[in-house]
Curated annotation (Swiss-Prot):
SUPFAM superfamilies: Indolic compounds 2,3-dioxygenase-like. This is Tryptophan 2,3-dioxygenase. The lineage of its organism: Eukaryota, Metazoa, Chordata, Craniata, Vertebrata. GO terms for biological process: L-tryptophan catabolic process to acetyl-CoA; L-tryptophan catabolic process to kynurenine; L-tryptophan metabolic process; protein homotetramerization; response to nitroglycerin. Heme-dependent dioxygenase that catalyzes the oxidative cleavage of the L-tryptophan (L-Trp) pyrrole ring and converts L-tryptophan to N-formyl-L-kynurenine. Catalyzes the oxidative cleavage of the indole moiety. It comes from Rattus norvegicus. Homotetramer. Dimer of dimers. Induction: By dexamethasone. Belongs to the tryptophan 2,3-dioxygenase family.
């Protein structure tokens, strides 16, 4: 049967749909263009004229414009902008600790939120190397001669970041056999010196951990009970292995037991801890380490959930900074091989030496896993008696709302 393909009910249905779409389109155009009435607009608010005109290609100035220099500049400027945001978040967290606001535990969520934001930014910075790696070594070599003596080591913000988090000056790898600050002059040098004299995030977290509820000898006395349980558990473990028939497997288990025993008993040797602290192998005070371990073991308890998340974020930051350094090393090796850096350093070899625990700030938190024990060795708590697990400390004089935070 033939006929008009547009006859029948289908026409009404189609027209109806078109009518509905027209109505939706009309609704989408009912807004008001407030920008036309004057006032602050997008470009002015973001200062885009300054930002988007801040890319001066040295190759172009020298009369030999190289395309990939633009990518090189943009990528490093993006890094510096994100470093600025990280410092902004870090300074706000340090201020919360310094002013004693953490004594009101309601403020810990704000601390945790901002530190998590730093973690997310660092993840972005680690991934950002993949953009720069779209440039080949030959492409980079085309404009490298125009960069000297500029160097990534001269990033003031990254050095400030290291100092404010808590990188030990005594553990820094010398740059061309000089103190790192000697590569900065004037106001930059003074800013770095000031940042060395301020309380670091590590020191502030250390003081906070020392106040962990449950460490009090006349209270729950976690450390005393934990040591007692460890000694009892080790004795039971020894007798269990000793009761087995002589065999190669028994010898292996006994050797492993002795190693575990040495590690666990060293945990209760305060003098040894202080010695390792003086060498830079440990970073937290003895009591702060106790607090961190207590939070680690009781992380599922209501009062310790946010503190545990904070400790996890601190480890994430350390890990991501190490990954950032490593990615930087790999990129430099790929672009320069073993040649000297543009700033005069040994390049790849210098950068490679910075990818180590020397630059890890919260290394003690990573090492907590060394002290994992069977759950029944962990001191038990009675929630009826030990109400501190469910009763947070708060003080109206220490609490501040979002409006008062900055």
């Amino acid at each position: 049967m033939s006929g008009c393909p547009f006859s029948g009910n289908s026409v009404g249905y189609t027209l109806k749909n078109l009518s509905m779409e027209d109505n939706e389109e009309d609704g989408a155009q009912t807004g008001v263009n407030r920008a036309s009435k004057g006032g602050l607009i997008y470009g002015d608010y973001l200062q885009l004229e300054k930002i988007l005109n801040a890319q001066e290609l040295q190759s172009e100035i020298k009369g030999n414009k190289i395309h990939d220099e633009h990518l090189f500049i943009i990528t490093h400027q993006a890094y510096e902008l994100w470093f600025k945001q990280i410092l902004w978040e870090l300074d706000s967290v340090r201020e919360i600790f310094q002013n004693g606001h953490v004594r009101d535990e309601r403020n810990m969520l704000k601390v945790m939120t901002r530190m998590h934001r730093v973690v997310v930014i660092f993840k972005l910075l680690v991934q950002q190397f993949s953009v720069l790696e779209t440039m080949t070594a030959l492409d980079f070599n085309d404009f490298r001669e125009y960069l000297s003596p500029a160097s990534g080591f001269q990033s003031l913000q990254f050095r400030l970041l290291e100092n404010k988090i808590g990188v030990l000056q005594s553990l820094r790898v010398p740059y061309n056999r000089k103190h790192y600050r000697d590569n900065f002059e004037g106001d930059y040098n003074e800013l770095l010196l000031k940042s060395e004299q301020e309380q670091t995030l590590l020191q502030l977290v250390e003081a906070w951990l020392e106040r962990t509820p449950g460490l009090e000898p006349h209270g729950f006395n976690f450390w005393g009970k934990f040591e007692k349980n460890i000694l009892k558990g080790l004795e039971e473990e020894f007798l269990k292995i000793q009761a087995k028939k002589d065999s190669e497997e028994k010898e292996e288990q006994m050797a492993e037991f002795r190693k575990q025993k040495e590690v666990l008993l060293c945990l209760f040797d305060e003098k040894r801890h202080d010695y390792l602290l003086s060498k830079g192998e440990r970073r937290l005070s003895y009591r702060a380490l106790q607090g961190a371990l207590m939070i680690y073991f009781y992380r599922e308890e209501p009062r310790f959930q946010v503190p545990f998340q904070l400790l996890t974020s601190l480890m994430d930051i350390d890990t991501l900074m190490t990954k950032w350094r490593y990615n930087h090393v790999c990129m430099v090796h790929r672009m320069l091989g073993s040649k000297a850096g543009t700033g005069g350093s040994s390049g790849y070899y210098y950068l490679r030496s910075t990818v180590s625990d020397r630059y890890k700030v919260f290394v003690d938190l990573f090492n907590l896993s060394s002290y994992l024990v069977p759950r029944h060795w962990i001191p038990k708590m009675n929630p009826i008696i030990h109400k501190f697990l469910y009763t947070a400390e708060y003080s109206d004089s220490s609490y501040f709302s979002s409006d008062e935070s900055d």
